[in-house]
Design a protein with these regions (language model features):
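N-terminal capping/small domains of soluble enzymes
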Residues: 1-100, 106
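Alpha/beta enzyme core
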Residues: 107-243, 252-267
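Small/polar glycine-rich anion-binding or flexible loop at a beta-alpha turn
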Residues: 248-252, 274, 306
């Protein structure tokens, strides 16, 4: 029988499947719905140093092949997470071996550093740094657009954080390979990509943009081939693990990312369509492996690179 166990930064996960931040709450919301023995880890709801109420107006808008969201990082803040939600995630770790990942955003270098330092002293396993947040000091441009700015914030967080550090990239980055190299040089232990793609929707009846901020984040099957291309580029640019995400909805989707060289994958929008998506994807991966005589993921990880 296929063995889906995956080593990510020294943590041996049940499978390469990680619940993507913002789509599974803190994991506990899914405990009665999903078989956590099939799930490798959970990246909790995106955090900021101080709690945020999130965006007003419409927050979700379905497209023919995806979902546009404008949540606005609604969250209770880092300290509240450490005091309350983290304890619930740690129960999942104790019961099922689920790797606990804290996703951290920020609106200034100082916020990133302070939040990372607090998480570093907590019981989380991995800190996932979301650098898609706007930098208020430079007119709101996301940290993840230019390699120099991204490298600088990662370097500062690295100095403050003793935990394994995974950096989540924006697809709006000017140059994915150069961005990955800058982040690796700044001390990142792993890279996850890609975050949502900027998108727009118009409400015909109201004759105005759906979202108050006009632009919002597109995820789902529509973005998968582009995300796969970016993962391919990232794997070729760095020597640290790459976690792939973007439109993964089936076992075959996940296996594409593994064959492109990803160490693990995250599942996001699919969880809204099917609360059991993560375990279903793991089961489909195992079934394909059994059918094709593949015993472990290491046998096929990156295989497409040598056959391309």
């Amino acid at each position: 029988m296929a063995d889906l166990k995956t080593n990510l930064l020294g943590f041996v996960m049940n499978s390469p499947i990680i619940g993507a931040s913002g789509t599974v709450g803190y994991g506990v919301e899914y405990e009665e719905l999903a078989d956590f023995s099939r799930i490798g880890g959970i990246s909790g709801k995106g955090l900021t140093l101080h709690g945020q109420y999130g965006n007003k107006g419409e927050r979700l808008w379905e497209t023919p092949s995806g979902l546009i969201n404008s949540i606005g990082l609604q969250n209770p803040g880092v300290q509240h997470f450490i005091d309350v939600e983290l304890n619930e995630m740690l129960e999942l770790r104790q019961k099922y071996g689920t790797v606990v990942i804290a996703n951290l955003g920020g609106h200034s270098e100082e916020e990133y550093v302070e939040g990372a330092a607090m998480l570093s002293d907590s019981a989380v396993d991995i800190v996932e740094l979301n650098i898609s947040c706007p930098n208020v000091k430079v007119g709101g441009m996301a940290y993840g657009v230019k390699a120099e700015a991204a490298g600088e914030v990662v370097r500062m967080v690295r100095d403050a954080c003793k935990k394994p550090l995974m950096v989540k990239l924006s697809p709006q980055a000017e140059n994915i390979p150069e961005m990955c190299k800058a982040i690796e040089a700044a001390g990142a232990d792993a890279i996850s990509l890609t975050n949502t793609f900027q998108a727009c929707a118009i409400d015909l009846e109201k004759r105005k943009p759906v979202f108050n901020n006009i632009f919002a984040g597109l995820s789902g099957p529509a973005v998968r081939p582009i995300a796969l291309r970016m993962v391919w580029q990232a794997v070729g640019a760095v020597n640290i693990p790459v976690v792939g995400l973007g439109g993964i909805a089936t076992g075959r989707d996940a296996l594409e990312f593994i064959m492109a060289g990803a160490t693990a994958v995250q599942v996001g929008a699919a969880n809204f369509a099917n609360p059991r998506a993560m375990e279903t994807i793991a089961e489909e991966m195992a079934a394909w492996m059994d059918k094709n005589g593949v015993k472990t993921l290491d046998e096929i990880r990156g295989c497409a690179r040598s056959n391309g």
